[in-house]
Structure formats: structure tokens, C-alpha cells
Amino acid sequence: APNDIASFSGQVTNLAFLLSSQCKGAVAFGDYFVAFNYYVVKEFGEIWYEKLNCISTSEHHIISRTIKDSIEKGMKQFIWGVNQPAGNRSYNSPFTNVSWYDKYYFKSLFEDFYYPDGSKPKWKQIDTLQRMFMELMRKIRLIKPITFPVTTMALVHNNKEYLDNDYKELCAEEWAKGGSFFCYNSDNPTSLASCCRVLNEMSDNTFSSTTGMTGVMTGSCNVITLNINRITQDYFRTVDTNYFGNSGILYQDITEEDMDGFKKYLIDILERVYKYHIAYKTMLYELEDKGMLAASNGGYIYIKKLYSTIGVIGYTEAAQFLGLEINNNKEYKEFLQL
């Protein structure tokens, strides 16, 4: 098991590659900051957040680092690690998700969670780590357009307003500064969503792996992305002979009959994707039942906890191909709702 920030960051990065190589889907660390905090406390004490500007290196180090620098170094190790291409994934990076929480989400999910030494995570610790990570991701993206981890902010509301006003303001400020993350709004803080996946019930939260992670399990076992631009152009250029080879198609000139044909063409593709997802997940269930999935054997994740995901890209380009203006107009919204 890891015993400091560096070894924890290295093992979590390796775990992302391990899990994604077995399922070819998206790995979600819904408890990254809770686990990360355990090793920060082990190195710098319970109130490390009050000592961020204190020097943590000795006179023997060429590079002088503060406690904040040392913590960010571990975060960078994880961020840069999961953005490396992997040979067993056709040289793609492992699709990695990380969740942020407001105070009420944190209390609901981790109020009764204990670390191996009997201590408990404190909100001030997690809050500080989340803000540091958020700022670090934004700064790194000014240098390099990194993809992962995809981050999702989970906020609790009462159907009228957000309960944690500080995190409501934090989200607005980060978006205004150019931060990029999803936001999941819920009136039920026992459920969790990451990236494009639907919510996952978190009330059964019992297992802790050797990485120090909690029992929060979420992710995707398979991701298939539909390129709407490619599908649209294929149909109107090749399938529907009324528009064969025509690169100047206008949305308003498409007949209702032809639009119905396009919808059927899209549905046929979706049905093939559904069948592939079902077949692939059935195979994973069979492997799991036979004890052939190391991730399940180790208790990291179970196939029933994983979603089969359909991604969508190319809507804007498809609309432009059909001569639509990309703004808040009736025809564009109509096309998006096909």
C-alpha cells in the first residue's frame, strides 16, 4: 500500500490504466480527494492547510518547495500520468473522471468514513484540496490542452437554491476564469454522477481498497461515441439519392419525408450500438462470474456498477453542413432535438 503522496499518486495512476485496460471504458475516482488527503495529513499533519506557504524541503534540496508545492507535485503526477497514451488502448489515454463536492455532498457521503488509522477527513481539508486542484487544472490548460481527468462538481439544492453558497460562487468564478468542468445538481446527496454518466446510488459505501480509496464506485465499462457530423453527411451525401454529392444542402429545404428517413438512419445506428453494448457487457458479466476480472476480484469495481456510455460529438459541424446558424434560433434547436 502507498505510504506518502508520491506513492499514492503513482498507484492511482496505475490503477486508472489497469481498470481501463480491462473494461475499455471510463474510470471514475469519486473519492480522489478524500483518499489524497490521508497521505497529505500523514506527511504534513492535521492542519496542513494552515501551513501551505511553509518550506517543506531541506537545505540539501536544490529546488526549494513549500507544502503547497509538494501537494501540487502529487496532483501533477496524477494529471500528467492519466494523459499519457497507453499501448493497450490503441495509444489513447485512459478516460479518467474525478468528482468535486460541496460541503453538503461531502457530509452525506463521507461523514461516517474513517481512515485506516481511525481518523476522519475534515471538510476544510477536502475543500482546500479541491480548490487547489481546480486552480491547478486551469493553469495547466493554459500551457497544454490536457483532456483528463474530466471533472464534475456535485452540488446539492432544495429545488429553489443551492445549499452551499460558497461553492455556488466558486463554480461561477471558475467558469468565468475559463475553468472547464461539468456540474451535477441533485436534491439527493446519496447519488453521484461523473461526466456524461447518469447518477449512481452511493448508499452502499463499504469497501476500501489498498489505495486508500473509499467504497465509492462509479464509471463506465464501455464508451462508444457517435460523430453526428459524419452520420449526417453520410446520409445526405450517399444514402438519400435526392441529395447525392450535394455540399450545399439547406436545412429548410429538406422535406419531411427525407428528415424521417434521416431519423430512421440514426435510429438504426443507435440500435446497433445498443446491441454491441449489451453483448460486450454480457461478456464482462460472464468473465466476472468466472473470476477472470482482476478488478472485480480485488473489489475495486463490479460490472453492475458500471454504465455503458454513448457519447455524441459533431453536432455543431453537422448543423453548419446543413446551413444552420449556430445560435439560439428555432431551426437550430429543432435540429438538436432530433
Name the predicted role of every residue range.
Residues 308-321:
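Contiguous, well-ordered alpha-helical segments that form the cores/surfaces of helical PPI scaffolds
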Residues 1-304, 325, 329-338:
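Conserved catalytic cores of very large enzyme subunits
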